[in-house]
Structure formats: C-alpha cells, structure tokens
C-alpha cells in the first residue's frame, strides 16, 4: 500500500517530462540539445523550462548534431560548468569518438540515454544496443527500471560523477518509448531537497586563463598507461560511491531503487533471473506467480553496468541452483548479450559454481510477453537439474522469417 501522504505528492506525467524536471532541479549550467526519437521530448521540455525562466544561470545550446552536443559539453565542463544532455541510438553512436575524450579528460558530464535499437535496418523502438556499444568508453552506465528511478538517478549520478575522487562522466539509461513516453504516477524531485542532497559542482581543476592547465594533452608511451590506470581506479572508487549515494538518497527522499544491484525474492531463490531496465517489472510479475505456487524464483536487478559489480553479483547468486540472464542486446560474433558475458566472466574465477544461461530478447522493441518469461524460467529449472545444453540463444524467433 502506498502511504496516503506520499500519494498526494504523486502526479501523472510523461516520462520525458519527469526526467527533464529532474535535470532542471539539478541546476545545470549548460544544456546541449539535438532532437532524436525517442529522446526529443526531454530536450523539448527543458527548452520550455528555459523559456519560462525556470533554470537560472544556465545556457541552452541548440546544436546541429549529436557530435556537437557532446563537444559543447566537453568545453563547458572543462571550465567548471555542470552539464547535461540527452540522446539515443544513432545520436549516441555519432558521439562515440568524443565520449572517449570526455571520460579521458575526466569531465563529469551527465547524460540521459533513451535506449533505442541501432541501424541498419532502421528501427526506432527500444533495446539496449546503443548504450552497450559504448560500454568501453569510460562512462558510468546506470540502467533504470521505471520513470521514478530515471528521475531519482540523475541527482545521484551527478553526485557520484562530480566527486573529486572519481570525476568520470555517466549515463542514465532508460528504455526508449517504454519509459520515455509512458505516463505514470511519479513524485517530481523537490528543489529544496535536491539542493540539500546535491551540492554545487566545485572541481579542483578547470580551464582558467589566470591559472593555466592543459586538458587532453598529448601523452607518450611513458605516461599513457598511467592515465588508463587512474581512470580505471576512479571507476573502482565509484563502486562504493554508487552504493553510498543510493542510501543517502533514500535518507533524504525516502526512495531506494538499489545501489549497484537490487534483489527481489532473492534471499532463498533457487532460480535467479538477471536483467536490466524496464523488463524487470514484467519479470517480477511472473516471479510473483511462481512464488504463489511455492517455487523459489528470484530476480537480480543489475543497476550499474559500468562499473560492473562483480563481487556483488557473485554474492547475490552464490546459493542459486541456476541463473538465467536476459539481455536486450547482442554482441555479434559471440551469440551472447553483454550482461551474460560479463556475468560468466565474474563467476569464472570465483568460488561460486552455478550454471548460467542467457537469452537475448526484445530486439528492436519486440514485445516480451509474460509467457516468454515463464518459458525461460522453465528452461532454467531444467538446467538446474540436468546441466546446460544451449548456453545462449535468441528468444521468440519467428521461424517463418528466417
């Protein structure tokens, strides 16, 4: 039951509006904007907020393409501005080169990605291929389950990214259309609470003609490796910071969506279903039905894909009889989704010996009915008893199209 006092705070708004409102109350200094479906509504709402004078001390920059959008934020962040943008799919791919520059210069840019399939063939619907393709660019990636979490994760990610021990950019990844265009009840972030939770951005190093420094300098073989090492160390420092920030957010706002991971019916689970994003809601509904029959099925939500929470995942599944990983992406050439590959990797040298299988699902926005989730669970139960026969496969292929 939702507390009546809490219910009174809830409003029914579009996901994109809620995210734009969250970005607004984080008090950005520079917003760069280029429209691309299904992200467009986010920057449209921010444009309206700017026109209405609701975002003080902020510059809204209309650019001609996504490469310029991220480039504008690189310059702004380097001089000490809190920056924000939003993109998706081909726009995120166009940013690819500059994503490395952003993270390599240790600029804590924060961006919302309304996850969408990539071309070709052209597809505007949801999967995670766009962000997964950027997993090695040095950005943090936090995947959200619903609109409320998409709102609440933005100030958390700013706080993590802008920590002077970390200084790494980050993406809040929300499922395009499924979350960006849905209308559902949310509590919009309050300005006073957000001001208390998220302090102003105060970087130790900025571009300043009075105190000249170099960003993105030329690095020879004598120094380049140390840059990469320090970047990786910052990511490792982000692991406990993500956990601590989620708990601090709960203390201020009363809401908790998980830290690096989150469990549902997990403590005694014999079969564990792992996933990221909005599909978790469907999975939980199916698991509830299994639990009603007395079957010990649980859900492991992976919230942080970068940095990857190896220790937390190993601990979460150590007592399981079998694990199934659902991926809304495919790493072409491996016949595996990225979360499945990462999960196997972190278990390999651990003391946890549990069979893991994977399914790639929902490509290009294909519907994922509860019957398909139930089928996956039934197959995983067979693995727990008899072992793995097929390690990873596509789900719900239409044979008549092959």
From Swiss-Prot:
SUPFAM superfamilies associated with the record: Thiamin diphosphate-binding fold (THDP-binding), TK C-terminal domain-like
Catalysis performed (reactions): 2 oxidized [2Fe-2S]-[ferredoxin] + pyruvate + CoA = 2 reduced [2Fe-2S]-[ferredoxin] + acetyl-CoA + CO2 + H(+)
InterPro entries: PFOR_II, Pyruvate:ferred/Flavod_OxRd, Pyruvate_synthase_PorA, Pyrv_Fd/Flavodoxin_OxRdtase_N, THDP-binding, Transketo_C/PFOR_II
Enzyme class: oxidoreductase
GO molecular function, one term: pyruvate synthase activity
Signal peptide: none
BP-aspect Gene Ontology terms: response to oxidative stress
Superkingdom as given in the UniProt entry: Archaea
Keyword field: Oxidoreductase
NCBIfam families associated with the record: PorA_Arch (NF040682)
Subunit note: Heterotetramer of one alpha, one beta, one delta and one gamma chain.
The protein's name: Pyruvate synthase subunit PorA
